[in-house]
Regions:
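N-terminal Rossmann-like NAD(P)+-binding domain of SDR-like oxidoreductases, especially those catalyzing
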Residues: 1-138
Length: 138
């Protein structure tokens, strides 16, 4: 399968990429490498993916519609795994527009890319912040 993986430089993204690559999938990873936390850590994760010939990285932002349109046009993806998100509740109160751009606009851009380019599978992980302060755990 050829998979577009957003948030590829994140902790979960890098591990998902490794699993997919080890099973033989082609992975195109995209990440904006923002400075919400140390970018050196993100770059180190990407270094771990470099040895895989079936991994390709794009430094880009899912909220940029034109970047995604170009990516979908050329990519011919079988699936999209969306792990890109601006996380952290406290920061969202200080910078709500960053959250809207990534978590809403970026998400919509991905859905539209899938719709217009016949991508049959879409996985969306969201973030732990959506669960709030629950006292009951499943």
């Amino acid at each position: 399968m050829k998979i577009l993986l957003t948030g590829a430089a994140g902790f979960i993204g890098m591990h998902v990429a490794q699993i997919l690559l080890k099973r033989g999938d082609e992975v195109v990873g995209i990440d904006n490498l923002n400075d919400y936390y140390d970018t050196a850590l993100k770059l180190a994760r990407l270094e771990q993916l470099k040895p895989y010939p079936n991994f390709h990285f794009i430094h880009g932002d899912i909220s940029d519609r034109m970047t995604l349109e170009d990516l979908f046009e050329k990519g011919h993806f079988d699936a999209v795994i969306n792990l890109a998100a601006q996380a952290g509740v406290r920061y969202s109160l200080k910078n709500p527009h960053a959250y809207v751009q990534s978590n809403i606009v970026g998400f919509a851009n991905l859905l539209e890319g899938c719709r217009h380019h016949g991508v049959k599978h879409f996985v969306y992980a969201s973030s732990s912040s959506v669960y709030g302060a629950n006292t009951k755990i499943p």
